[in-house]
């Protein structure tokens, strides 16, 4: 598969979040979709880390169906564009962070927009969305970043989204995340919700997250494409970040 994730295993006090926050930096919208699906799963308290079948169709983020299908309150903090200082997220809430991967790392612009976020021992899910090549150290980087700001990373995941370089002529993970991806994300979130309710709220080591195997030929083709893309960018630049 091309989805990787970790869940918390340490036993502490049971926790039932009163509110689920999604905190996203998502220029193309793919990270926002994954974050919304995981957050909906967290609120449902069901499913399995490895079984997307437990999550049926996932409503689109922001729809009435999505809001009415879960009991928890939802707040989206979208930091894609410059905004005011975000609120401090309380310890009785849960936060779902999602950012895109750029060159195996979290995009510097994402870290800049997230730097003012603060928690109070708030459990956090850290998610990286990558263009089907590699997520590198982005997940571990994001986990360390939010931990420094008062959050406890209790789960981590990496999901595929359509690459920002994708075009009709050279599609890269075209149409991702698709319905199956969102079902996987919701199932993952549901398992996290269960673990929180069972008191498994200790921090995870996001560095243990392993990438799916990528055939060498696919890597070489991608590298060739990127080199060509960069040459074209020098001639006719296209802005990929807001």
Cite the ranges covered by each PLM segment.
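Iron-sulfur cluster-binding cysteine motifs and their immediate structural context
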Residues: 240-242
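Short, positively charged and aromatic/hydrophobic N-terminal segments
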Residues: 3-11
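FMN-binding flavodoxin-like domain, especially the glycine-rich phosphate-binding loop
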Residues: 10-54, 59-234
